[in-house]
Amino acid sequence: MANLGCWMLVLFVATWSDLGLCKKRPKPGGWNTGGSRYPGQGSPGGNRYPPQGGGGWGQPHGGGWGQPHGGGWGQPHGGGWGQPHGGGWGQGGGTHNQWHKPSKPKTSMKHMAGAAAAGAVVGGLGGYMLGSAMSRPLIHFGNDYEDRYYRENMYRYPNQVYYRPVDQYSNQNNFVHDCVNITIKQHTVTTTTKGENFTETDVKMMERVVEQMCITQYEKESQAYYQRGSSMVLFSSPPVILLISFLIFLIVG
């Protein structure tokens, strides 16, 4: 890890040093550097426009470019660009009109639902989170009757599980046991409230289904937890901290 960080540091130092030198090189020419941008004008540093009797370029009476009476570009009476009577750009008022500020976009319900779909903390359940929807697993119960019963009634069983963060458990078995209990309890209460009851066969099948889903949820959460821990270790190593500090110095400087 240290060797990798050192090589990354050397590579970024070389790249950003070259970019920093490029930024500091003076650019030739440019606006107001003394060079004439129009043919037939005076010496460098002189007036960029031909002398007129108080008017704009090619105008006899002080008007704007192509205007006879002091108007803005394309205006006869002092108006702003595209306005006939003294208005600002696109406005009929004075010169202090502000731009029209667009209204803030409204947050759609689709975005709000997507943000709360995965891992949302469920209120009133003591820190439990609701996992993403899963496909119900195909399970064989050992006899044709139960297999057929499961296929015909699987839609009545949960497709999401309740769980707590994996770092609150010492092993997978504890996580799965708690996950199964709270999920079946919540699903049973909700379904019973709607007037539907479960038989012993339903409870048996739900336990098997929810157990498989809780194992899948544990594997998913464990992998995410490990990746977060690895990222923290990487960014806390001295070479990476030095590299990030150097990049910030180059950007700010």
From Swiss-Prot:
Signal peptide range: 1-22
Lipidated residues (GPI-anchor amidated serine): 230
Function, in words: Its primary physiological function is unclear. Has cytoprotective activity against internal or environmental stresses. May play a role in neuronal development and synaptic plasticity. May be required for neuronal myelin sheath maintenance. May play a role in iron uptake and iron homeostasis. Soluble oligomers are toxic to cultured neuroblastoma cells and induce apoptosis (in vitro). Association with GPC1 (via its heparan sulfate chains) targets PRNP to lipid rafts. Also provides Cu(2+) or Zn(2+) for the ascorbate-mediated GPC1 deaminase degradation of its heparan sulfate side chains.
Basic residues composition bias: residue spans: 98-108
Organism: Macaca fascicularis
InterPro entries associated with the record: Prion (IPR000817), Prion/Doppel_b-ribbon_dom_sf (IPR036924), Prion/Doppel_prot_b-ribbon_dom (IPR022416), Prion_copper_b_octapeptide (IPR020949), Prion_N (IPR025860)
Keywords, alphabetical: Amyloid, Cell membrane, Copper, Disulfide bond, Glycoprotein, Golgi apparatus, GPI-anchor, Lipoprotein, Membrane, Metal-binding, Prion, Repeat, Signal, Zinc
Residues that, per the record, bind Cu(2+) 1: 61-63
Keyword Mitochondrion: no
Record's subunit section: Monomer and homodimer. Has a tendency to aggregate into amyloid fibrils containing a cross-beta spine, formed by a steric zipper of superposed beta-strands. Soluble oligomers may represent an intermediate stage on the path to fibril formation. Copper binding may promote oligomerization. Interacts with GRB2, APP, ERI3/PRNPIP and SYN1. Mislocalized cytosolically exposed PrP interacts with MGRN1; this interaction alters MGRN1 subcellular location and causes lysosomal enlargement. Interacts with KIAA1191.
Residues at which Cu(2+) 3 binds: 77-79
Known glycosylation sites: 181, 197
Localization per Swiss-Prot or TrEMBL: Cell membrane; Golgi apparatus
Name of the protein: Major prion protein
